[in-house]
Amino acid sequence: MEYQGQQHGRVDEYGNPVAGHGVGTGMGTHGGVGTGAAAGGHYQPMRDEHQTGRGILHRSGSSSSSSSEDDGMGGRRKKGIKEKIKEKLPGGHGDQQHNAGTYGYGQQGTGMAGTGGTYGQQGHTGMTGMGATDGTYGQQGHTGMAGTGAHGTAATGGTYGQQGHTGMTGTGMHGTGGTYGQQGHTGMTGTGMHGTGGTYGQHGTDTGEKKGIMDKIKEKLPGQH
């Protein structure tokens, strides 16, 4: 097939020759005359934005700076979730761990013993399990029948650590019964009047048959014989 046409000797910006689009007529092999645009082969370098070998990807928008970073090859790669989290943490460090809830506060209930009273009262083997409750400052009721601690009942009554161990009473009236740690062990003893009767830890152990309470008080008072 004959080809006639004009070719413009132009070059592109890189100096490569660019064939022009000429209009020519060609004589077909079978005598037909045809007209058409000359197929001047354009040569253009591959300058698409998606170039093989470089992988250039142009992005628009403000979020690209925070969600991607340069991969060193002219492109950008997606940041991982851990890297994003590290950037959002104060100072950009993600290796600071805050252990929450490691210092819990627990309360332990130990039963009904010593519930009603104040300052650590203990009731050990009373029938109700609430021995020496109304007394103050650490009274202990061990084996009394009641041990519930209304003033003047078993293992109560006295203040500042009075202890009633086995008898049904062992205390006496309110505010009596050996202030500051008097202990009544078996019977009706361990009582005494207010401010007397075994101050600072006197022990009343027997059944009250050896000496009367008033005799004991007189012996303890200064100047009394």
UniProtKB/Swiss-Prot annotation:
Assigned keywords, A-Z: Repeat, Stress response
GO cellular component: cytosol
UniProt feature, compositional bias: Gly residues: 21-39
Segments annotated as Sequence repeats: 105-118, 119-136, 137-159, 160-178, 179-199
Superkingdom of origin organism: Eukaryota
Region: 5 X approximate tandem repeats, residue numbers: 105-199
Alphabetized PROSITE patterns for the sequence: DEHYDRIN_1, DEHYDRIN_2
Protein family per UniProt: Belongs to the plant dehydrin family.
Protein name: Dehydrin DHN4
